[in-house]
Structures are given as structure tokens and as C-alpha cells.
């Protein structure tokens, strides 16, 4: 931050905004629904000699080869995506509306407008956890600034910021649709 100020940037410190209680559940639902649709589209266009043509095929393949494909971790995310509502369902559309309002209208757009700034900056995310073969990845509750831009679909640029205990961390620069 000091280097940016020295280079002429005006820094305005902003406290993060709150999210509704059902925000993270809604964003996971949208992610699961979209993941299934777009992965199916990608896999269906794979070369003919690749037998996995859909997420359902991939889950079946992983189950048939569990000793290798699931030797350490399962496929909970794939399985929850298979069960996710279709993108034309009211459940999906309601969740999408909630996360767009939270991350766009009440999030990035509001922060830019209310603080009269052109760009938001913050740590991209927490330090990545070490692989834990017993408990799985244990992430902190804080998702990082990059998540707001990722969920909103707005521009986000992440650049290296340094390291913490030898693990690289980044800083995100994001802005609105205009």
C-alpha cells in the first residue's frame, strides 16, 4: 500500500460489507448448478476416444476406480453438482438473484459509489492450507476479497503480494461493470 501511495495512488480504507445469512449457501448452489452444465458441455465436445462425456460419467469412472481416483479425497463436490437444481429452476434463479444483488448492487458497485473510488483492493484469499489426508483441506471462514469479484462476474486482477510461511499470497484489484 505504501508503494502505491508513493506512486501517486490515493488509498481509502474501507471496512468490508456484510453478506446475508444465506449468501454462501446460495453461491454454492449456483456454483454447483453451473459447474454441472458447463462441465457437461466441455466433456461432450471431447475427442471421441475419451469415454467420459459428462459429469455423471466422471463420477461413475471415479467410483469404478476409487482405489486410485479417490485414494485420498472423495468427490463430494462432483456429487453435489449432480444433485444441484437446473439453471432454469426457480431455486437456481432465486439464488442467482441473491448473489448478484449481494456482490454487485450491494457489494462492489455500492463500495465504489459510496467511497468514490475507481478500484477496490484487498487480499485475494487466505493462505492455502496444507494438504491434510485425515481432515481434508481446512480453510478459514474468511474467503478473501477475490471471492466477491469471482461470484459477481466482475473484473478481477490478482497479482503476487508476497509469501506467508513460504506460501504465495496475492492481492486482488477489482472494479464494477462500468
Predicted feature residues:
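Acidic/polar loop patches that form or flank catalytic/metal-binding clefts of enzymes
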Residues: 9-15, 49-56, 119, 157
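Generic alpha-helix detector with strongest preference for long hydrophobic helices that associate
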Residues: 19-24, 29, 58, 76, ...
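Glycine-rich, small-residue loops and helix-cap segments
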Residues: 79-178
Amino acid at each position: 500500500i505504501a508503494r502505491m501511495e508513493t506512486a501517486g495512488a490515493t488509498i481509502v480504507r474501507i471496512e468490508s460489507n456484510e453478506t446475508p445469512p444465506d449468501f454462501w449457501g446460495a453461491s454454492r448452489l449456483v456454483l454447483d448448478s453451473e459447474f454441472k452444465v458447463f462441465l457437461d458441455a466441455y466433456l461432450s465436445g471431447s475427442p471421441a476416444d475419451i469415454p467420459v462425456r459428462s459429469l455423471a460419467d466422471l463420477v461413475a469412472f471415479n467410483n469404478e476406480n476409487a482405489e486410485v481416483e479417490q485414494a485420498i479425497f472423495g468427490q463430494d463436490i462432483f456429487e453435489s453438482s449432480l444433485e444441484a437444481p437446473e439453471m432454469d429452476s426457480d431455486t437456481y434463479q432465486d439464488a442467482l438473484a441473491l448473489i448478484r444483488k449481494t456482490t454487485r448492487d450491494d457489494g462492489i458497485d455500492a463500495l465504489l459509489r459510496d467511497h468514490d473510488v475507481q478500484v477496490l483492493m484487498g487480499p485475494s484469499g487466505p493462505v492455502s492450507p496444507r494438504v491434510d489426508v485425515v481432515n481434508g483441506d481446512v480453510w478459514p471462514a474468511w474467503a478473501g476479497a477475490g471471492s466477491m469479484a469471482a461470484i459477481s462476474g466482475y473484473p478481477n486482477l490478482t497479482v503476487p503480494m508476497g509469501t506467508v510461511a513460504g506460501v504465495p499470497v496475492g492481492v486482488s484489484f477489482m472494479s464494477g461493470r462500468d
